[in-house]
Amino acid sequence: MVQIGPLAIRWYGVLLTLAIFLGYELARRRLRAWGWDLEPFERVVFWAVVFGVVGARLGYVLTSPGYFLENPLEALYIWHGGLSFHGAILGGGLTFYYFHRRRGYPLWPYLDAATPGVALGIVAGRIGNLMNGSDTAGRLTTLPIGFTWPEWARGFPGVCPGIDDISEVYRCAELLRGPVHLTQVYGAVVGLILLFLSLYWLRKRPFYGYAFWQFVLWYSVLRSVLEEPFRLNPLWLPVYRNDELGIGLFTATQVVSLPLVLLSLYMLRRLGKGEASRR
């Protein structure tokens, strides 16, 4: 974080902003190559970003209802951290759908073209989490990959003073003891995998909507397998917990991911059949 007088510039916001602009440019180039008019896309993308952020914050708030019922104004303080990528995809996707229904803008080509940008956003967000220190904390672990934060890394101690919520106190205490799963890096790896996969899906593209639904499918799977089991998040369905290895099942994200996987498979099959019937 860089402090300029009363203004705090956080790595998280800087990196996400860069990812948005780069993703926007990649989408424009892809749509131009496909022969689509760019003007409608340029109109809708601003609102897609706005409602993507709203959806991301709302998704995070819904996973911690107790805290935000007691502190409702905190739901507006997005700079305090806490965004859900599932919520971002939903908010942005619904915005594209609204403009599709109201103004006839293309839906699936726009969503397909946006997938590399979303992947970049995941990578940027997780690197920002790492720079902030206290975000997306990992569970304690005895595995060799466990990481102990050095004393000079002030991100975690900085969030501990003055905390009233007992779960946050526990989170701070756990992180200070270490070693922990470095889940910020796990999440960035998920984003990188999705970036390369999305570029492959766009080249393959047997039909419009293919890249988008493949993205939703594999984001849900990869995050549920490679990141969520190791994060210090409450278990909505406490099916399995190993405090020695630092593994827990199932978090809210994992629970939400299952219907998204099923929906993605259904939509891929449906859109694929529609394309086959037109041939």
UniProtKB/Swiss-Prot annotation:
Record's subcellular location: Cell inner membrane
GO process annotations (BP): lipoprotein biosynthetic process
UniProt xrefs under Pfam families: LGT
E.C. number: 2.5.1.145
Involved pathway(s): Protein modification; lipoprotein biosynthesis (diacylglyceryl transfer)
GO molecular function: phosphatidylglycerol-prolipoprotein diacylglyceryl transferase activity
CC annotations in GO: plasma membrane
4Fe-4S is among the record's keywords: no
Binding residues for a 1,2-diacyl-sn-glycero-3-phospho-(1'-sn-glycerol): 126
Mode of membrane association: Multi-pass membrane protein
Signal sequence interval, chain numbering: none
Keyword Cell inner membrane among record annotations: yes
Enzyme class, first EC level, given as a word: transferase
Keyword terms: Cell inner membrane, Cell membrane, Membrane, Transferase, Transmembrane, Transmembrane helix
Transmembrane segments: 4-24, 44-64, 76-96, 104-124, 182-202, 206-226, 245-265
Known role: Catalyzes the transfer of the diacylglyceryl group from phosphatidylglycerol to the sulfhydryl group of the N-terminal cysteine of a prolipoprotein, the first step in the formation of mature lipoproteins.
Family the entry assigns: Belongs to the Lgt family.
NCBIfam families the UniProt entry points to: lgt (TIGR00544), PRK00052.4-5 (NF000784)
Name recorded for this polypeptide: Phosphatidylglycerol--prolipoprotein diacylglyceryl transferase
Organism: Thermus thermophilus (strain ATCC 27634 / DSM 579 / HB8)
Gene: lgt
